[in-house]
Design a protein with these regions (language model features):
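Formylglycine-dependent sulfatase
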Residues: 1-247
């Protein structure tokens, strides 16, 4: 009597490899089937995350030591037309809490957590060895970069990171607290807390330090960051015009 599998397929020995050719195997995380031979296997390709149609680009600007009324839309005597336009076309918040230190503010902004819960209770330099003061974002704290990257956005960052201890500022690592290990596809800027705006002491690109110590007379760090940000966004638009970005 012919032997059949669950789908009714004949598993008698008329197959050149024999009845075991029709056996199927499944693996966790794999939606296809693996048979004894290629003709009895079903492939499955992992699809990259794709943002919804019409998903917006997300631009976040964090400025150190910025007072409440230091921009025009909040009453500054200094003209800030581009920031004012962003405010006019978006939302302005007047009730908020912020830590008056750079590293804790960055950790809270990226994770949505109180800075102690995020692991950054004070400015990141040394790890004092107490809970809430790890000098880097906790590994189980999900960042905005991770959420948007995993939802289909390109995740980019330029500027000052300041979310890893001094012991992680070398090429030797560990690099657990670096931007590319914390949800970002690209990074350009500095990892520590400050630098010279005309001659930065150590610049980083993606996951490595740059060997640059000679800058032109008209070099200005902020202009460099702006140019790099535009370049990153341009590369995304050229390579994948419909993919949104988070910067």
């Amino acid at each position: 009597m012919p032997r059949q599998d669950d789908s009714g397929r004949d598993m008698t020995s008329d197959h050149p490899v024999g009845p075991r050719a029709y056996e199927k195997f499944s693996y966790d995380g794999f939606d296809g089937e693996v048979g004894r031979i290629m003709s009895t296997s079903t492939p499955a390709w992992t699809r990259p995350p794709t943002a919804p149609d019409g998903a917006p680009n997300v631009l976040v600007v964090l400025v150190d030591d910025l007072g409440f009324s230091d921009v025009g839309c909040f009453g500054s005597e200094i003209d800030t037309p581009h920031v004012d336009r962003l405010a006019a076309e978006g939302l302005r918040y007047v009730n908020f809490h912020v830590n008056p230190m750079c590293s804790p503010t960055r950790a809270s902004l990226l994770t949505g957590l109180n800075h102690h819960l995020a692991g950054v209770g004070t400015v990141c330099h040394m790890e004092p060895g107490f809970p809430g003061y790890a000098a880097s974002i906790r590994s189980d704290a999900v960042t905005m970069g991770e959420v948007l990257r995993d939802a289909g956005w390109s995740s980019l960052m330029v500027g000052k990171w300041h979310l890893c201890p001094d012991s992680q500022l070398t090429e030797a690592g560990p690099k657990d607290g670096w931007p590319l290990q914390t949800g970002f596809d690209r990074f350009y800027g500095i990892l520590d807390g400050f630098t010279n705006f005309h001659q930065p002491h150590r610049l980083y690109e993606d996951n490595h330090a740059l060997d640059v110590d000679d800058f032109p007379d008209d070099y200005y760090f902020t202009d460099d960051l702006t140019d790099r940000a535009l370049s990153m966004v341009g590369e995304i638009c050229d390579g994948h015009p419909t993919k949104p970005w988070f910067l």
